[in-house]
């Protein structure tokens, strides 16, 4: 398994949810809304309605997936329903 931890914000609008995609399919939704005062300060977040709860975390059980190379990406959905895809990269799952 592996953990995904991060943060996301959208000034004036706010983030509604963050989903994890593998090969462009939603596999899970993260636990969004964890306190991240450091992000508010470092990124000068002023008007996101979720301040200071901009953090997220998720534990992914890799045994649910075949050993392979996957396209990983986050799908951010703001409170207006606008979708932003972020962080696309290739990840290798290799369960021993």
Give the location of each predicted region.
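Basic, ligand-binding patches in group-transfer machinery
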Residues: 1-96
